[in-house]
Amino acid sequence: MKNKKLLTMVLAAAMVVGSITVPAPMATVKADTVTTSRTNILREDGVVVSQQHGSARSLIDGDITTVWDTNGWNGSQAGFPGSGKHNYSVWAEFTLADYYNVSDFNVWFKDETTQKNTAWQYKIEASIDNSNWDLVVDQTENTVTDKHFENIVGKDYKNKIYKYVKVSIVGAKTDMKPWPAMTEFAAYGERATAL
């Protein structure tokens, strides 16, 4: 009987310990740099943008004080002022360091007076061939005004292999007149073992 109680207690403890999940470390903003224990899988020399005013390399330099922004406010006014909705069509496309199963992304938007209280609307797509794109993160109806977003890839795409990633700013919900601008973009995942 004593052994049965001991076995029951050991099994119960094992079940509790086995059910505890520890969240993976996510990139966080600290001061003027991006701090993470994970490696951004975007290649430094593999970024192409639709247009730029600030350097496209600013998106992956780990410094949130550097900015990639567009050539000014070019959105559809959609009834501005007062409508609160602007449409954009700007993007940044990245080549991954290798073929990856991409798991998640971090996006940092510019934080200044004209961007305050702006809910940036964006989408993230991924491709293996740079021609056929999967919509892996859809924030095109976003109404949250944060400047940093952690995005988990949709379950239908977690096991797919990708070589290219594109983030597109498609809109903004605000009464301001902001230029589309991002300070940092990061992708995380596991290197694919086979194609």
Q: Where are these predicted regions, by residue range?
A:
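Predominantly extracellular/luminal regions of secreted and cell-surface proteins
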Residues: 32-70
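Short glycine-/Asp-/Thr-/Trp-enriched loop segments that recur within the blades
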Residues: 145-149
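Feature responds to low-complexity, polar/acidic, surface-exposed segments characteristic
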Residues: 24-27, 37-39, 47, 142
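Solvent-exposed serine/threonine-rich low-complexity stretches and specific carbohydrate-binding patches
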Residues: 135-144
